């Protein structure tokens, strides 16, 4: 196996790397609460469409 084939060759079934945003595919800043599976940037842009209301 060459050097370029080593990275991401092992399947990720658990941990932070296994979960990605359903909108953009990003794995950083993921909101999993209520089954959103959405990163915080996508949540800010789509929160009103989902039904979340900002009180402050």
From Swiss-Prot:
Keyword Metal-binding: yes
GO BP terms in the entry: cytoplasmic translation
Keywords per UniProt: Metal-binding, Ribonucleoprotein, Ribosomal protein, Zinc
Cofactor note: Binds 1 zinc ion per subunit.
Name this polypeptide is given: Small ribosomal subunit protein uS14
The keyword Nucleotide-binding is annotated on this UniProt entry: no
GO cellular component: cytosolic small ribosomal subunit
Pfam families with a match to the protein in the record: Ribosomal_S14 (PF00253)
Domain of life: Eukaryota
Residues that hold Zn(2+) according to the record: 21, 24, 39, 42
Cofactor(s) in the UniProt record: Zn(2+)
Gene Ontology MF term list: structural constituent of ribosome; zinc ion binding
Alphabetized InterPro entries for the sequence: Ribosomal_uS14 (IPR001209), RIbosomal_uS14_euk_arc (IPR039744), Ribosomal_uS14_sf (IPR043140)
Family: Belongs to the universal ribosomal protein uS14 family.
């Amino acid at each position: 196996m060459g050097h370029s084939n080593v990275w991401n060759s092992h399947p990720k079934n658990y941990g932070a790397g296994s979960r990605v945003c359903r909108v953009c595919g990003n794995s950083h800043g993921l909101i999993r609460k209520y089954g959103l599976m959405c990163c915080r940037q996508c949540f800010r842009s789509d929160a009103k469409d989902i039904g979340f209301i900002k009180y402050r």
